[in-house]
Amino acid sequence: MGIIKDRFKAKADIASAEIKSIIKDHGNKKVGEVTLAQIYQGMRGITGLVTETSLLDAQEGIRFRGYSIPELQDKLPKAPNGGEPLPEGLFYLMLMNELPTEEQANHITSVWQRRSHVPNHVFATIDALPLSTHPMTMFVVGVMALQTESNFAKQYANGMNKKDYWDATYDDAMDLIARLPRIAAYIYRRKYRNNEHIQPNGLLDWAGNFAHMMGYDDESFKELMRLYMTIHADHEGGNVSAHTTHLVGSALSDPFLSYAAGMNGLAGPLHGLANQEVIKWIFEMQEQLGTDSPTKEQIAQYVQDTLNAGKVVPGYGHAVLRKTDPRFSAQMEFGKKHMPDDKLVNTVWNIYETVPPILQSLGKIKNPWPNVDAHSGALLVHYGFVEYEFYTVLFAVSRALGVMASLCWDRALGSPLERPKSVTTESVKLWLEGKDQIWE
């Protein structure tokens, strides 16, 4: 086995023993109550999952293994002459529950480089789709075509011992993450750049190489990709893409199938399209106002008109967070460093100063602050990356880091098949009348 794989197994064995002890000693303790409203309304607020890689703090935002976004920007290794964290370092942290050294992060880079070869049939499968196909559809089809390379599926078919599930899952996860930038970049160049492809550069890191293969060799764009891939990598386990990947994986579907399922969830408008909606809203505002540099007063009036029309301001509000999303702040700092005079970016900042007070004045909104989606699109547009449909693919490549690290832990800890109980409305009515005990 490899160095990282050996250390991961040792850590997982310790964690597994600890969890078994917790369940043995405290398994009957209740962790909360569930209301009928929660059951009917998306199970929001119900604690029903364990995800080791990240936890959402209402005040500090997402914490990866206990570290906030600002702490990660300070402590994670960076590319030579770079200022943003390497996603390889974040993956190591989520997998190993410890901060990596520069050497360890670079080792992940080299492992992914060695595993990055994509078989020709994957590209042929993508090429068989009409050019008009949505890039997320192409992406998921590409991942499904890559499933032929699954170590887990082959070993399971040959009678693999369940104690070895984690090993094959780890190999699949590393292969999948390594190959995603190649698949995504191929789709980008096929759909938007006349099918003129760029070969990978084996000297670049994972995110830098992704930028290169898409055709962006500006060093600051590579930095943006490193930041983007880091801050979008994980967001607890209850969101649609993470939960779906975990759920499908619990049936012992291999990591390729599980990840593809999760990304079909990410493609949904309520999950992965938010940054597109933000850019669309800003462009509509600029067009209606007849200026690409609206004043704060003009923005305030447009926001009021949006709200009066019964619409929401995209990019603002969060189900849990009660302050400005630190992922927004990280992107804002990137903008100040690399594009302080960009008109669209400055408009995003003016919206940031304008919207929260208006939302607060309504008195109905717990969180009037911007989330991660309020800023990311404007940074991409600065570099001429205006293929908005592809933004979700960027999100998908990033999210692989978190869901694959979690899937490795699921199999290493022997997580069982997920199978919650469901009820009918008729049985609920009988229960309310005291005629049925559906909760027993």
Residue ranges and their predicted role:
Residues 1-440:
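Hydrophobic alpha-helical bundle cores within soluble ligand-binding/oligomerization subdomains
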